[in-house]
Amino acid sequence: MANIIKVRDDYEPIQFESTSGLNKFKICEGSSASWTDQEFTVKDLRSRIEPWLTSLFQSEHLSLLVGAGLTHAVHYLAANKAAAGMSALDLNNYKDEIDNRAKESAEKAGRKEGNLEDQLRVANELLRGLEILGDSKADNLRDELNGGMKDFAQSILSSENGIVTANEDKREQAFNTLVTFLMSFASRIGVRERLNIFTTNYDRLIEAGAEIAGLHLLDRFLGNLMPIFRSSRLDLDMHYNPPGIRGEPRYLEGVARYTKLHGSVDWVQTDRDIRRIGLPFGATDITPFFQTPSLYGATAHELMIYPNAAKDRETAGYPYVELFRDFASAVCRPNSVLVTYGYSFGDEHINRTIRDMLTIPSTHLVVISYDDPLDRIMQIYNEMGRPSQISLMIGAELADLTKLTQNYLPKAAIDKTTFRMSELLKQRMDPMQSDKEHKKQETTASDTGLEEL
């Protein structure tokens, strides 16, 4: 697959591919670029991409949307294979009806085939209808759904476990790359608004990376032993008092707001509340962690994995309505930048919000993706019709996690030494550039004088 780049003042996406030389590329037939000849190197790409991303990352409002691509990338670095995917539910009751309806739902959302989430949505709707009718088949379907949810949770845990149990050197390299990735976005000076991290993933990979990096994540949960999900959105933050200065708290650096749009493998509905249970990263089985009196005999069917909403009738869609509202309020603002990594644009809720965001002229969308097998990203790009507000980095040469962090993402540092060095280099380079321009003008003038003689 060819790589696609569109940054800065590129009018349209540019396709390029590798040549026989190491780290050398050429423009594909049918594409053209004003900033390079037919062939160029990684150094040329870096000088094109890195300053652009650096300026975008220091915008007034910055949000990062992470999809399954990040989990697969880190898992591949650690275990040399992709993470477990979402396999279809194995049902005996109403299998054909559920599969057909799930496929219809997927096609309406612009996807060719239904996935596990589509099946869960349809199966839960059917189960609710059978319960209303008092049909005896409701018990059988509920048992099958419970087993399917347990298998799905098990596949999520196996992906986490695959990273934890990988070779120590590879595991350390994978987590170091993840930390560099996260801190490239989170390294914002304290007076800027906090980075907003959104993810559609159910695993806890970002939480693990943030813990290693020392990055504080603020979410809607309150408490320590079994944090409870709060419906009210309180803009809590972290501050510190500088030594010797009282009454002037300053923002603590290394803080980000975190939202899991599709729920998490460790969120469980308990009676009227949603709680986050103490499920260790890399655990092999979730069942033992349900064996506590405070969970009221919960099973895998009570896991908050989208679209498995809370079961009381008056809050259909809870807590996902609140989570999607957080996403919309964070990105649909002037001077807002949204960066997506590993997101395939398969969720119409999210796509609709992104479309609304781009109606604000000062917003910008950066799409970073390892591939686009269904051509969904380019289809969305063309449908939105706002090329000047969208940057694209698609392909293994641009979006491979190691190459991305080493070559293209901004340096994950906001220390004063870095800023002082940048200013010093700028001051030194300006006089040098002026001298070069002055000498060039003198040479041109003398050549012109000789020609006149």
In which residue ranges do the predicted regions lie?
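Gly/serine-rich nucleotide phosphate-binding loop at the start of the catalytic core
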Residues: 1-210, 216-217
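SIR2/sirtuin-family catalytic core signature
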Residues: 1-64, 110, 114, 248, ...
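Short beta-strand/turn micro-motifs composed of small residues
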Residues: 66, 199, 262, 367-369
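Short, glycine/serine-rich, charged loops/turns that create anion-binding
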Residues: 69-70, 202, 263-265, 345, ...
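A short acidic (Asp/Glu
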Residues: 73-79, 205-211, 270-272, 348-354, ...
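Flexible internal linker/loop segments at domain or repeat junctions
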Residues: 282-325, 330
